[in-house]
């Protein structure tokens, strides 16, 4: 076996198995011998783990263990016939080289390490790669499957010591769940211990149960009887404090109080609600309270001091607080009620961290302060909007059922309870309906009346005199909508215009700019969302006339709670887009990662889609140029990895004109734009993108190994993408694709060049017909350099349905080989050009061809006598060609390995760069860590498309060269030496004959002897018998020479013809279709990188 040295691969496990320079001297030589003719799958952990971690048990680095056969065996999955078939359970069972069991769920990309593994793990498949075999010691397959998994298996691993300079380097695998390290305070621990002791001692539980019954018996049905509750708690405390079981509890009284509260809460609460029945606060009639009615101090500020921005921030606080106060109805203890009350006030005042919604609010919300009166007024609104029932009952509970009476009088809780008490008094004053309260009630009624008119579609219930509602025009509802916003959403545009024109001083432009709902929707956003284009145009006209460019940019790019600007809501509003397009931040993304341009591109239900898309793209392009940059396609990728090409329904030429555009980019599901177009039958897009030279037609979806052909269910779609396949094929003549199974019979779609009306034709042909066609061609061309026997055998195995990834890779490989094979046959005119118009044409041609072949005379009837000079000429011709072919074959072998390694090392470079960046960011030294951010790389020295095409052509050419070389080798080193051997024997026989019978001109035949002497068989002499025996041997030797010579002559003629065909094919394949195409594509790639 030859020794070769190729670059070391980054992943130690992949390198150890596939890239051994001297396998016969390797410590893994037995493993290599075992796997020599077998197919297998390799599970490969990330390089980061193998290079930077070590095994806990053996203390050895994982990269050293990669050269240990015992370690490697668990990562090698042996393939059987069942490996190609999906079972109904969709799980594939595999056995490792050392007999362990692994189950792969292909659909979920999950691997389960089961029987035999001392650590059972659930592994995630990060990536599936097909590794072309480049070594000389594995003969079982031309390609091997590598499943990259998220962590090593069958060992415990920890980071190496040198990683201590990195901060928190250890990573938890994605499929592992870290157990949170929760700190439990001492009181919670004591409560748990207290309850455990009670459950262990039933006598104590019985005593407490009697006290519970005592409360239920003694307390009246409409009186919560605080004194009775405190009495039984004290009684229990007196009985327990001297008990040795409870002597270690530092908070025994609190524990007993909470335990009694837990068991008696329902009884206490039912008595409370009964007690306050008919006297509770009814917030229903105050639902129209607004900020403008309660925060009069804000609205009475001078024009220069008042900012509507403050009101919108308060509205958001009110919304958060109202939502939180609604939880009060779910509480069942003093602690829970007090916690909700305090947190509600904190959210209202902005004095503490709020929930996740607040994190999206402007910073000013947390910095705004307010006095006690303002807080009470706002809390009134909170109570109204939360629709809180039993408010007095909650207040009474908080005031009377604390385990520490001072907590409700002092501190933050005391302040909260006092505020709640003030709010209750506030509502009681409202019920008296006197003085200012009466005025407020009147305003509520007037507000209700106006809102009813604004929301009513009955023309008889319209607003007749807007002036009568002047004092409530500053109203804002619980969603933060102003009267303007309510008019917009209800399409009351005539009222909107009246307000904007008649009450301009009450609604200045500054307030229009700051008017937002609690979810951040501006008036313009509300207009677009409501489909009120007339209102939108009015607002835009006002803004354009009164605002500076800076104000316009700020306003138009304001975002709502979904991080959407007004541009994200534009779908078919062409005029609005044109009027505000130059002020839109086209790079601004919403919470889904979608830019305004992305949102417009995916709004498919608009009537003028193409025009809208073109206009939006042109405006965005202009915006980029205005900001001194070129349109950046990568700015518009969403959180799912979808690009503009993925979502564009039609008119993709506007994007294909971009130079720095990856038209083969995958989203996070592994779908390319072409796959999406094929899946949803977007024919115009398919037509445009298949004409782009940058397209990789057979890009594979990593998770399923589907290509675009697997998503094609329509014949017109298959034909369209098949045409591109033909153009990309070796000689642009034919393309095999889309293998399908029907009742275990495999069929394939074939697109080929046609002489009919259409330039291309796509037909469905049974694979058995293709197999028969190959057999017929092989009979006509027994010395063909095409490996037809290999293809015939592989087609015989296509009787499996529901192929797994493994089967799909084999099918894809076979279809590629058949495409190349028939391209060559058509190129050399071995078969007619219109053969694949339909299956009947193929069958007819095969019958005609068989008939012609049977009519040809056999060469064995008239064997040709070959002279030594002729044999020498043939031998010299074949030796010269054999040397040339062998030299070329060696060059192809080197070129194939170089191409494979260009791709492998490019991936290694990318992985190493990512690992370096990740480690650099974890450096403890911040200056050193920041230095890694400036690293720039460019590993795309070659186009993925051009490399794949060139490698496929080189591999095919190498197969053909090996096939032809084997035929030449047989003739040159077997047939011709055999002829020379028999020729020497023939000469020796002649020499013996002349020496023994010098007077004989030529050897006599048996017939001559018998005619001369009828009874010669009995009387012939010993000399005559010897002469006859030599004559027979000479005749047999002469016949053998003629047969061998004739066989060599025919083989030589056919080989000479095949060599000529091969040279023609080789030149066209390597020079024109491979190297030139490779160079052209890469020049284009490098130009795009400049």
From Swiss-Prot:
GO terms for cellular component: early endosome; late endosome; plasma membrane; transport vesicle; tubular endosome. GO terms for biological process: early endosome to late endosome transport. It holds the Pfam family VPS9. Residues 289-436 form the VPS9 domain. It comes from the Eukaryota. GO terms for molecular function: guanyl-nucleotide exchange factor activity; SNARE binding. Belongs to the UPF0507 family. This is UPF0507 protein SCRG_01893. It comes from Saccharomyces cerevisiae (strain RM11-1a) (Baker's yeast). The lineage of its organism: Eukaryota, Fungi, Dikarya, Ascomycota, Saccharomycotina.
């Amino acid at each position: 076996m030859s020794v070769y040295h190729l670059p070391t691969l980054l992943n130690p496990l992949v390198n150890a198995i596939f890239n051994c320079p001297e396998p016969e001297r390797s410590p893994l030589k037995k493993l290599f011998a075992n796997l020599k003719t077998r197919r297998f799958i390799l599970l490969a952990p990330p390089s980061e783990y193998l290079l930077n971690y070590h095994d806990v048990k053996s203390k050895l680095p994982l990269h050293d263990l990669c050269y240990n056969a015992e370690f490697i065996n668990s990562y090698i999955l042996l393939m059987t016939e069942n490996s190609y078939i999906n079972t109904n359970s969709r799980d594939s069972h595999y056995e490792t080289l050392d007999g362990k069991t692994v189950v792969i769920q292909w659909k979920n990309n999950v691997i389960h390490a089961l029987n035999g593994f001392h650590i059972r793990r659930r592994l995630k498949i990060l990536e599936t790669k097909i590794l072309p075999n480049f070594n000389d010691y594995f003969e079982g397959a031309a390609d091997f499957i590598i499943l990259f998994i998220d962590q090593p298996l069958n060992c415990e691993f920890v980071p190496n010591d040198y990683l201590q300079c990195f901060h928190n380097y250890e990573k938890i695998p994605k499929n592992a769940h870290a157990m949170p390290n929760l700190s439990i305070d001492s009181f919670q621990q004591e409560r748990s211990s207290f309850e455990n002791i009670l459950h262990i001692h039933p006598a104590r539980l019985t005593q407490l149960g009697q006290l519970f019954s005592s409360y239920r018996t003694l307390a009246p049905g409409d009186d919560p009887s605080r004194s009775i509750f405190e009495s039984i708690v004290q009684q229990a405390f007196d009985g327990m404090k001297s008990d040795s079981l409870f002597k270690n509890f530092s908070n025994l009284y609190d524990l007993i109080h909470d335990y009694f509260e837990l068991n008696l809460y329902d009884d206490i609460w039912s008595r409370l609600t009964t007690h306050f029945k008919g006297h509770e606060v009814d917030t229903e009639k105050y639902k129209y309270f607004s900020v403008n009615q309660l925060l009069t101090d804000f609205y009475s500020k001078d024009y220069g001091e008042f900012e509507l921005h403050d009101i919108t921030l308060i509205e958001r606080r009110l919304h958060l607080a109202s939502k939180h106060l609604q939880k009060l109805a779910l509480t069942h203890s003093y602690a829970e009620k007090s916690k909700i009350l305090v947190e509600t006030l904190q959210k209202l005042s902005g004095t503490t961290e709020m929930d996740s919604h607040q994190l999206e609010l402007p910073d000013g919300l947390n910095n705004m302060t307010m006095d006690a009166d303002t807080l009470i007024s706002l809390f009134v609104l909170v109570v109204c909007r939360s629709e809180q029932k039993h408010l007095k009952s909650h207040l009474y509970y908080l005031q009377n059922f604390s385990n520490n009476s001072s907590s409700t009088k002092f501190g933050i809780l005391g302040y909260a309870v006092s505020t709640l008490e003030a709010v209750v008094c506030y509502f009681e004053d409202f019920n008296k309906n006197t003085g200012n309260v009466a005025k407020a009630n009147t305003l509520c009624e007037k507000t209700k009346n106006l809102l009813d008119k604004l929301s009513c579609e009955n023309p008889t219930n319209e607003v007749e005199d807007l002036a009568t509602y002047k004092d409530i025009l500053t109203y804002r509802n619980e969603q933060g909508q102003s009267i303007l916003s309510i008019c917009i959403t209800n399409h009351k545009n005539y009222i909107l215009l009246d307000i904007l024109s008649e009450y301009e001083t009450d609604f200045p432009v500054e307030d229009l700019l700051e008017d937002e709902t609690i979810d951040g929707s501006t008036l313009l956003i509300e207009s677009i969302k409501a489909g009120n284009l007339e209102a939108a145009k009015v607002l835009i006209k006002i803004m354009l006339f009164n605002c500076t460019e800076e104000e316009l940019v700020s306003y138009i790019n304001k975002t709502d709670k979904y991080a959407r600007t007004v541009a994200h809501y534009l779908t078919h509003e062409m005029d609005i887009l044109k009027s505000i397009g130059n002020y839109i931040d086209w790079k601004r993304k919403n919470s889904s990662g979608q830019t305004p341009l992305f949102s417009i591109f995916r709004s498919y239900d608009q009537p003028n889609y193409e025009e809208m898309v073109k206009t939006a793209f042109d405006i965005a392009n202009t915006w980029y140029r205005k900001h001194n940059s070129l349109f950046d396609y990568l700015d518009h990728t969403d959180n799912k990895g979808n690009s503009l090409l993925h979502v564009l329904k039609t008119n993709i030429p506007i994007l294909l004109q971009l130079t720095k555009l990856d038209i083969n980019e995958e989203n996070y599901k592994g779908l390319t734009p072409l796959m999406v177009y094929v899946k949803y039958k977007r024919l115009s897009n398919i037509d445009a993108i298949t004409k782009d030279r940058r397209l990789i037609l057979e890009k594979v979806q990593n998770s399923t190994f589907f290509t675009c052909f697997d998503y094609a269910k329509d014949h017109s779609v298959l034909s369209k993408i098949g045409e591109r396949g033909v153009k990309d094929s070796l000689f642009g003549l034919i393309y095999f694709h889309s293998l399908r199974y029907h009742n275990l019979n495999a069929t394939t779609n074939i697109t080929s060049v046609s002489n009919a009306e259409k330039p291309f034709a796509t037909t469905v042909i049974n694979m058995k017909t293709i197999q028969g066609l190959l057999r017929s061609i092989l009979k006509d061309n027994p010395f063909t350099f095409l490996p037809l026997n290999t293809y015939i055998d592989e087609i015989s195995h296509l009787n499996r349905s529901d192929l797994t990834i493994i089967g799909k890779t084999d099918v894809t490989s076979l279809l590629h080989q058949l495409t190349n094979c028939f391209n060559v046959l058509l190129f050399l005119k071995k078969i007619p050009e219109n053969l694949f118009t339909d299956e009947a044409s193929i069958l007819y041609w095969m019958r005609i061809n068989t008939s012609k072949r049977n009519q040809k005379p056999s060469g064995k009837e008239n064997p040709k006598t070959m002279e030594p000079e002729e044999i020498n000429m043939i031998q010299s011709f074949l030796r010269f060609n054999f040397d040339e072919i062998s030299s070329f074959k060696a060059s192809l072998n080197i070129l194939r390995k170089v191409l494979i390694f260009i791709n492998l090392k490019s991936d290694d470079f990318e992985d190493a760069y990512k690992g370096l960046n990740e480690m650099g960011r974890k450096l403890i030294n911040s200056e050193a860590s920041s230095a890694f951010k400036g690293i720039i790389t460019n590993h795309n020295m070659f186009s993925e498309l051009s490399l794949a095409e060139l490698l496929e052509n080189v591999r095919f050419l190498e197969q053909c060269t090996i096939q032809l070389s084997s035929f030449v080798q047989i003739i040159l080193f077997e047939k011709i030496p055999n002829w020379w051997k028999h020729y020497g024997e023939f000469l020796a026989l002649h020499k013996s004959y002349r020496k023994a019978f010098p007077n004989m001109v030529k050897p006599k035949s048996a017939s001559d002897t018998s005619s001369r002497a009828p009874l010669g068989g009995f009387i012939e002499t010993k000399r005559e018998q010897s002469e006859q025996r030599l004559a027979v041997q000479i005749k047999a030797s002469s016949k053998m020479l003629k047969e061998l010579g004739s066989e060599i002559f025919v083989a030589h003629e056919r080989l000479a013809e095949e060599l000529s065909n091969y040279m023609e094919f080789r030149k066209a394949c390597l020079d024109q279709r491979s190297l030139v195409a490779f160079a052209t594509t890469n020049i284009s790639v490098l130009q795009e990188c400049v």
